[in-house]
A protein has these predicted regions:
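Macrodomain-like recognition of ADP-ribose-binding/processing modules
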Residues: 2-143
Length: 143
């Protein structure tokens, strides 16, 4: 019983260290700002605008690594159409353990999705030590 409790504390502490801040204004050298975008890469509002203004997102590029940011398209349909882009991101994160990815509430702003719709797409990322998720995503994933 003690081991189980000890394990739960370790998992809890690990997750607390991997919660994305709600207001990111600067990044460390190895940190990547992960934001919801549109396929056309028109980074006009929300986290996409922050990525463009502060973290090197490229106007006209809607997907993937751009400077110190990573775009996941969320404006082109439902959750089923977003899933492949999240899967692609998770593979990228697995291949780049030297980077730490700060996932914002992708799709939960201008795109209009709820946390409980988007969070399950990131379930595989829970096991990656180099991916931080919003607290609201953790709550959905642990429910």
């Amino acid at each position: 019983m003690y081991f189980c409790f000890d394990y739960e504390i370790k998992v809890f502490m690990m997750e607390k260290e991997r919660i994305t801040s709600e207001n990111i204004t600067s990044l460390k050298e190895n940190e990547i700002f992960v934001f919801g975008s549109n396929l056309a890469g028109m980074h006009g509002g929300g986290a996409a605008r922050v990525a463009y203004n502060k973290f090197g997102a490229i106007w006209g590029q809607g997907v993937g690594l751009q400077g110190q940011s990573y775009g996941i398209p969320t404006m082109h349909g439902g959750v089923v159409r977003i899933q492949p882009y999240v899967d692609e991101f998770i593979i990228f994160a697995e291949e780049h353990p030297e980077m730490h990815f700060l996932v914002t509430r992708v799709g939960c702003g201008i795109a209009g999705f709820k946390d409980e719709e988007i969070a399950p797409l990131f379930k595989r990322a829970m096991a990656l030590g180099n991916v931080s998720l919003p607290e609201s995503f953790w709550k959905c994933l642990e429910a």
